[in-house]
């Protein structure tokens, strides 16, 4: 009965674009108007405002975490199924990528996906975070780190997540993140992708 409202609330939480909100708070340009045009922490970092980038990263991860944790806490009182929790997780990411509050022009979903995974399975999130860190420090390319961690997510989920529906949600999340990184994949293949902190 409460499945659809829960998914809708999760989508609305996901639709809060912290890159835009934080940038506006600091009097910065809209991140959709410079760099890669992506409203995410990496692009905000291109403005030179490290604090704003950090707050964007934390905010985007937190909204994914909060949306799913809220559903999990209320799962029994509201009678939400495990599949409903999976749908809530996916809705938070969809909200980030296509936010109703910002003209459906959102980010690529890496931080929000991490927050979602943390709420579903801390072990899965930890594996992905460690892979991202190793790749980011090793190659200094944010998109490469994100893509590697994204590909690893469903594999880790299959080991650590207690419900099959959550594993399939992780597969869907990974596919969405990969889809949103299609331009980055092309740049990586062509050797044109920018380094972390670069201007492109």
Curated annotation (Swiss-Prot):
Pfam families according to UniProt: G3P_acyltransf (PF02660)
Keyword Glycoprotein in annotation: no
Keyword Ligase in annotation: no
Subcellular location(s) per record: Cell inner membrane
Protein's membrane topology: Multi-pass membrane protein
Gene Ontology CC terms: plasma membrane
Gene Ontology molecular functions: acyl-phosphate glycerol-3-phosphate acyltransferase activity
Reactions catalysed according to its record: an acyl phosphate + sn-glycerol 3-phosphate = a 1-acyl-sn-glycero-3-phosphate + phosphate
Ranges that cross the membrane: 2-22, 51-71, 84-104, 114-134, 159-179
Record InterPro entries: G3P_acylTferase_PlsY
Pathway annotation: Lipid metabolism; phospholipid metabolism
Keywords: Cell inner membrane, Cell membrane, Lipid biosynthesis, Lipid metabolism, Membrane, Phospholipid biosynthesis, Phospholipid metabolism, Transferase, Transmembrane, Transmembrane helix
EC primary class: transferase
GO aspect biological process, one term: phospholipid biosynthetic process
EC number: 2.3.1.275
Annotated family: Belongs to the PlsY family.
Complex and partners: Probably interacts with PlsX.
Cited function: Catalyzes the transfer of an acyl group from acyl-phosphate (acyl-PO(4)) to glycerol-3-phosphate (G3P) to form lysophosphatidic acid (LPA). This enzyme utilizes acyl-phosphate as fatty acyl donor, but not acyl-CoA or acyl-ACP.
NCBIfam families in the record: glycerol-3-phosphate 1-O-acyltransferase PlsY
Protein name per its UniProtKB record: Glycerol-3-phosphate acyltransferase
Species for this entry: Neisseria meningitidis serogroup B (strain ATCC BAA-335 / MC58)
Lineage start: Bacteria, Pseudomonadati, Pseudomonadota, Betaproteobacteria, Neisseriales
Gene name as annotated: plsY
